[in-house]
Design a protein with these regions (language model features):
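Sec-dependent bacterial lipoprotein signal peptides
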Residues: 1-19
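A structural "domain/chain start" motif
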Residues: 18-79, 178-186
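Surface-exposed short loop/turn segments
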Residues: 21-31, 88, 92-145, 152, ...
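Structural recognition of the beta-strand scaffold that forms the well-ordered cores
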Residues: 56, 147-148
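Short, histidine-centered active-site or binding-site loop motifs used for metal coordination
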Residues: 59-62, 151-155
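Sec/Tat-exported extracytoplasmic proteins
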Residues: 64, 77-92, 114, 170, ...
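Soluble non-cytosolic domains of exported or imported proteins
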Residues: 68-79, 132, 157-169
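Compositionally biased, intrinsically disordered linkers/stalks adjacent to structured regions
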Residues: 153, 159-186
Length: 186
């Protein structure tokens, strides 16, 4: 009797774990990559970026990673950050490269990258692909660095993978940082 109860409990535990993995994969398959940020040098309060009407995004520098970051990733991240900042509707102008006069410039360099790719990820094992960058938010009028942050995009889905998803995750992280310090919407 005790053995049957133990087997039933173990079977329930194994089955429940699998259901949780499937549920998580379904969720991340819908939501895509996630982004997070950590401020190394704070931008200031919740209205610190309100006075800037425009923002420009430089292509992030892959050279610190000594060839580990695919060259195409710099352009994908730049485009993803621009798209996410356009979504915020907080700036009258969002551009690749230099912003309009009196705007903000977001520039960065890649500092960590793991493409993942393990087939074991589909069943809950292995490392999730991630891409991290150190960014600076610069006042172009004074060329002063207003803040520094670490931004990371992580792909937790076994279905939606690849460099485009990682770039989108980094874009979400930058968007979150800007939304934390900008209250006005154009």
């Amino acid at each position: 009797m005790k053995r049957a109860l133990l087997v039933a409990m173990l079977l329930a535990a194994v089955t429940a774990t699998g259901c949780g993995t499937v549920a998580k994969q379904g969720y991340y398959g819908v939501t895509g990559a996630s982004g997070r940020y950590y401020e190394v040098k704070s931008l200031g309060g919740t209205t610190a970026l309100d006075r800037y009407p425009s923002v420009g995004v430089e292509a992030f520098d892959p050279s610190p990673m000594l060839g580990a970051v695919p060259p195409s990733l710099a352009g994908l991240v730049q485009a993803a950050v621009v798209n996410k900042l356009v979504e915020t509707k907080m700036f009258s102008s969002v551009a690749k490269g230099a912003p309009a006069a009196g705007g903000l410039l977001i520039r960065g360099k890649f500092v960590d990258f793991d493409p993942g790719g393990s087939a074991l990820r589909a069943v809950g094992f292995g490392v999730n692909p991630f891409l991290s960058a150190q960014i600076e938010v610069v006042d172009t009028g004074s060329n002063r660095v207003l803040g520094i942050a670490m931004v990371t995009g992580t792909v937790q889905s076994a279905v939606r993978t690849g460099t485009t998803e990682l770039a989108d995750g980094v874009g979400k992280a930058v968007k979150g940082l800007v939304e934390q310090h900008h209250t006005e919407r154009d």
